């Protein structure tokens, strides 16, 4: 079988399809938009020539019966939006070449059976919104190069199996809202250098096991805070140590950033005052003088 350049939706929603012929000549194909979307009975996939592919939007989305994936050539791919989204049967993922990829929105979202992830070259990626959202089986995450990434909205949301997180370079990030929402297994968090981010709303919401948050996280924060910048950022983080809360407030104070001119100005967080230090009072006073509203244990300071 020989195809032209466009294989868009060619096998879309063929629920009865259980295999794909390895003899398909796909060497000229550039567009794989939703090619095998909703092929829910597809149990395996052959090593096709996908070297010319640039668009892999939704290509294998909802192929829920796939348990593994071949090491295909995707070095020309730029857009991987939703490519393997909802491939809930995948237990592993190969070290494919995605070095040209810029858009990884929802790429592996809800791949719930993945327990680990390879060290892919994601250095060209700019958008990672919800890329690994609801990958609840992940127990570790690699030190990927995401230094060009700007959007991390909901990126690791619902990755409840992660207990730690790598010190990624997120220096270009502008949005990290809900990035680690309900990562209920996280016990500690690293420095990431997210100094260009304008919004952290819901970023660590519901991280119920999070105890340790680093000092100096916001010290070099230079972005202008967006509306509702810290809205519910640490709500539900009931295990945070007093030191971690002090680290957060002291660091925001050190940054010199003032509250946004619009939207919610609250920084709401639970604080174990019995093991705290006087430093928090100074931080609270400084932040209030810059327009922030500080709410500790449900009480406005």
Spans of features found by a protein language model:
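Negatively charged
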Residues: 1-301
